Amino acid sequence: MRKRKMSKKKKKTIFSMVIILILVIIGGGYFILNNNDLAKKIKEKVEVKKLKIVDQDSKTRPYAVMINNHAKARINHAGLDDAYIVYEAIAEGGLTRLMAIFKDKDTDRIGSVRSSRPYFLDYALENDAIYVHHGWSPQAQSDISTLNVNNINGIQESSNDFWRVKDKKSPHNMFTSTASILKIAERKGYATTSDKKSVLNYIDGDADLKEKYGIVEGQIESTLTEGKAINATKIVIPHSTLQTVEYDYDENSKTYVRYARGKVQTDYITGENIQTKNIIITMCDNYTLADSEEKGRQGLKNIGTFDGYYITDGYAIPIKCEKESRTAQTQYKDLKGNIIEVSDGNTFINICPQDAKIEIE
């Protein structure tokens, strides 16, 4: 039987279909590769936008560590460069004490660690942090119990986890580490994860105060009513007649170098200057507590709405600092009532008296 020859028309049709199929395969491959490249670019873009100072997706519970800021202890500061927030407030004798907040850091030496004061609990609680200290005042001891604060008191712990450095003088030589804090927290059965959001409203990159709020020439008085930014390359904060803190702006690093009573503060392990990207000033009054020991211990009137300043990248704006209760998170707002955006970087929060003569220039 003779095979029928395929017509030219049919051959042409099949050839066309083969060509179309090849083009579809090539086009599909190109589409897939192109989309993979696009997906990769989108992923890279998302990763670039992730904050550097703290992982906001992390559920790790922070640690709040009390840090000695006595004149003889400042030369022993260690680990502050790993803290993403540092609070500073008055203590007895006109001196200040620090509380450093750590999260997702492996810091070998933090200190020098000092005793608790009751109002620092308010800021540990608003961060849902495990509170770390070495000793306590009677008021702090009572409040830790009443408020059910998850705390670690170094006096009650092993010298392997809270240790004194022999070449430094006591009581300014007590140190701990994040590894020790985690070990003790797990032993005590404390939660080591938290769903609480950050106290600060961070943005990716720098908060451009000049662009967002406009700028007004002059000193502090110029910005109090208008809410605009002023130049802020030098900041002086008198916590008391005995304790003045100064920050000088370094344009190269776009951070502020910290000074105490005219001397630059450094990390004694690294030798690096202590610097901060952001400064927040909250102005609320302190008062002397009446107790039988008469040591001049202080209380803080920090519940309510208070004036303050937010400072970053060489500019400052006036803000309102609102705290509704001891456990409530402080809200930092501009004069229009909007939560301020905070630059991606570490922050020192200075809590000073309402009548303090703040200098910003």
Indicate residue ranges for each PLM-predicted region:
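N-terminal Lys/Arg-rich, disordered targeting/topogenic segments
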Residues: M1-T13
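A surface/extracellular/periplasmic glyco- and lipid-processing/surface-interacting theme
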Residues: K10-T13, A39-A83, E92-E361
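Hydrophobic single-pass membrane-insertion segments
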Residues: G28-I42
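Hydrophobic membrane-insertion alpha-helices, especially the h-region
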Residues: S16-G28
